[in-house]
Amino acid sequence: MDPFFLNTQHVELLVSGKQSSPQDLLGIVSESLNQDRIVLFRPGAKTVFVELQGKIQQAESHHSGIFSLPVTKGISPQDYRVYHQNGLLAHDPYAFPLLWGEIDSFLFHEGTHQHIYDRMGAIPCEIGGVPGVRFVIWAPHAQRVSVVGDFNCWHGLVNPLHKVSDQGVWELFVPGLTAGSCYKWEIVTASGQVLIKSDPYGKFFGSPPQSVSVVVDDRYEWGDKEWLDERSKKAEGPMNIYEVHVGSWRWQEEQPLNYRELADQLSLYCKQMHYTHVELLPVTEHPLNESWGYQTTGYYAPTSRYGSFEDLQYFIDTMHQHGIGVILDWVPGHFPVDSFAMSNFDGTPLYEYTRNPSPLHPHWHTYTFDYAKPEVCNFLLGSALFWIDKMHIDGIRVDAVSSMLYLDYGRNPGEWIPNRYGGRENLDAVRFLQQFNTIIHEKYPGVLTFAEESTTFPKITVSVEEGGLGFDYKWNMGWMHDTLHYFEKDFPYRPYHQSDLTFPQWYAFSERFLLPFSHDEVVHGKRSLIGKMPGDAWRQFAQLRLLLGYQICQPGKKLLFMGGEFGQGREWSPNRELDWDLLDIHYHQGVHLCSQKLNSLYVNSPQLWKGDHLPQSFRWIDFSDTRNGVVAYLRFASDEDKEALLCVHHFGVNHFLHYILPMLPMKSCSLLMNTDDLAFGGSGKGFRNPKMLTPEMVRKEKTSSELAPLDDDGSVAWGLDIEMPPSATLIFSVTLQ
């Protein structure tokens, strides 16, 4: 009778590539009370030699690639190594214990494993003093999963993983592998199809169009402890975000800067320009440049386009050491259909949402995630936690939240299935986002989450305990749309559209908002910011300076896409750098300087950022002068504060030497900022000292606008006589009585 390891059924499964439990057959097996046996599988080999306790022995050859060697009882995995056909001498993968445990299984299949990035994928480690790489993957419907790479000549039968749970987790430790080793998964589906897949949990990949996964050993020594210790305090401070696409900010020798070059230049630039944070368009790995990173295949991997895993850590570390936070654009709403990645990962739609008639999202022709599966939610949650823990990211901006929240997003009737209550809300996505925000805020105080959400879904920034989604901030897409819609109007038509400016204040404090002028507004025929402005060149630049001043003054955090700060003329393209040579032109220099001064004023003026989500931080002064296009309001740091900033925006083209604003009783008023400054390329008007007017003085003055009384009894208010420059923002420091 053949020994058990030559059992025909076991061997046939192994040879045919359908053995799900190779660890039960291979490695060190007990043969009797006094003897163990080393059992090896080497398909195609004629002889196999083993170094056993310093001596070389030839293993017995059996049929179908099975080899064995009898050994003394109690031998350990460290006591022997196997010679491979390529000359490599390595320990036996199947002699080492499997480390995926019951707690791992419980947490992962519940969707709450907060360190899944250290338990799934390719994990460099030592077992019993032997260095190597643990490979772990979830593929519940596979007949076999193997790890393939240069180390086994990409032969799928050499290193099959062991199925360690009935719920589809597979594991194998491969001794001797090191960081830099390339690998993929070879998966045999239930139907027998062989798939070659990248690792969803891979930490690095070959440069696109390559899709090979690369083992990473995270040994970076961080120098940002002071930043991390203070991060929770900074969360309530000013937030002025510079949105950056890494591959097109600056080029050198006709190539994008790498992560390290970018770190050294961008950190200094942000300090110079008074930005508090950078937000990176997705630097998660993605196959297509033209997706800008929003079609992710490597949720745990920095793109290799600009350097290594460690290079991106250096970038973030450098930004922190210069006092700049780093926010990551992150895409948990959909993923691309590329066959090498997650689509139909184990021969079934493992990650995909399948309950709609078509699995593809109509807007992007990508797959949406199935948030009803705990393992899928854990995959996404683990990605976010990985970027915070291992890469020291300070914030995560969740892309396309609306597409996650609504089952019918972008779909016509009949193209979607309602939830169990008959509604269109994706209840599983709601629960995932609540879990995402709860865990991040509990585990990493001071790390911020942002929702790019374009609908009126309620309570985006309300705490989970109060029934909200728990985000820190919501992108105010309505404000952005209405503001740009107004600015695009030619001057004679603006009086009929001033509600575009005033309407957003009706809901400005319903959420904690961020005010973006993002990359989406300067591509695909929408024109650059300055290209949207009407009039001749002088007026366009004046309007851009006005726009930047308007954004700084409005309640809400700030975000500006790169190039807007100096008047980039062409639409943005991911395939070229910004037009930095424009800074040789006076008008562009002026906008750049104006942006710098506005940013400095913002970060140094608590009235513009402290409590800016509260209604008491804002008070209208006048929005009635639609004919001249003037709005004015006060900004406060607290409801009891007498030190306020008066923000005045003139959207028209006329110059008024005397313009009287209604005003609260004042003790003093002085001009802080005028975007029409000659130094900014303006006309130099608007610098006459403001004159405070009592109600009695107001009655005697001739005004250029309809005076709107502020007092409840309808009596004439105080006034402020200012010089109003054309197309400008004025900011005054005011002490109220």
Curated annotation (Swiss-Prot):
State the species of origin.
Chlamydia muridarum (strain MoPn / Nigg)
Q: Name one GO cellular component term.
A: cytosol
Recorded protein name is 1,4-alpha-glucan branching enzyme GlgB
Q: Provide the top EC class.
A: transferase
Q: Which SMART domains match?
A: Aamy (SM00642)
What keywords appear on the UniProt entry?
Carbohydrate metabolism, Glycogen biosynthesis, Glycogen metabolism, Glycosyltransferase, Transferase
Q: InterPro entries from the xrefs? A: A-amylase/branching_C, Branching_enzy, GlgB, GlgB_N_E_set_prok, Glyco_hydro_13_cat_dom, Glyco_hydro_13_N, Glyco_hydro_b, Glycoside_hydrolase_SF
Protein family according to the UniProt entry: Belongs to the glycosyl hydrolase 13 family. GlgB subfamily.
- Which positions are catalytic residues? 399, 452
**What's its catalytic activity?**
Transfers a segment of a (1->4)-alpha-D-glucan chain to a primary hydroxy group in a similar glucan chain
- As recorded in UniProt, its EC number(s) are 2.4.1.18
**Disulphide bridges in this chain?**
none
Q: What single Pfam family name could you report for this chain, choosing any that match?
A: Alpha-amylase
The protein's annotated pathway: Glycan biosynthesis; glycogen biosynthesis
Tell me one GO biological process term: glycogen biosynthetic process
- State the function annotated in the UniProt record: Catalyzes the formation of the alpha-1,6-glucosidic linkages in glycogen by scission of a 1,4-alpha-linked oligosaccharide from growing alpha-1,4-glucan chains and the subsequent attachment of the oligosaccharide to the alpha-1,6 position.
Q: Which GO terms describe its molecular function?
A: 1,4-alpha-glucan branching enzyme activity; cation binding; hydrolase activity, hydrolyzing O-glycosyl compounds
Fill in the subunit field for this protein.
Answer: Monomer.
